[in-house]
Amino acid sequence: MAFSSGLWGPCVHMSRAFSQRCFSTTGSLGAIQKMTRVRVVDNSALGNTPYHRPPRCIHVYNKNGVGKVGDRILLAIKGQKKKALIVGHRMPGPTMTPRFDSNNVVLIEDNGNPVGTRIKTPIPTSLRQREGEFSKVLAIAQNFV
């Protein structure tokens, strides 16, 4: 280690051996697009059993390929392909919409019914305005933000 004084006071320079040992992992993306890691927030068996790889989005069912709250996506989860509904994302949205700490999804079947029987995290109230599409998902939600 070597010491030097800089503009903001003394600095410590680490040897080269320490800097080569550093590693980095990718953070979760703010918007949901292809290869984004997501978090399953319902109590379905498929979403809650531990697995060595996190679920990832492999397709977004809209025109621009960027998923927002209320969009449907296709997930790769435990070697299977499953549809999911986005119920929260990290990217800031319009005014008065909540920003979540993680990209949250609820697993759904092909006909739109949720796979689980309970949602563990709060979901945004903006989904209530589109009630016809998501009435069964809203019925199993416990908290709204």
Swiss-Prot record:
InterPro entries: Ribosomal_uL14 (IPR000218), Ribosomal_uL14_sf (IPR036853). It holds the Pfam family Ribosomal_L14. The keyword Mitochondrion applies. The keyword Ribonucleoprotein applies. Residues 1-30 form a transit peptide. It is found in: Mitochondrion. One of its GO terms (molecular function) is structural constituent of ribosome. Keywords: Mitochondrion, Ribonucleoprotein, Ribosomal protein, Transit peptide. SMART domains: Ribosomal_L14. This is Large ribosomal subunit protein uL14m. It comes from Bos taurus. The gene is MRPL14.
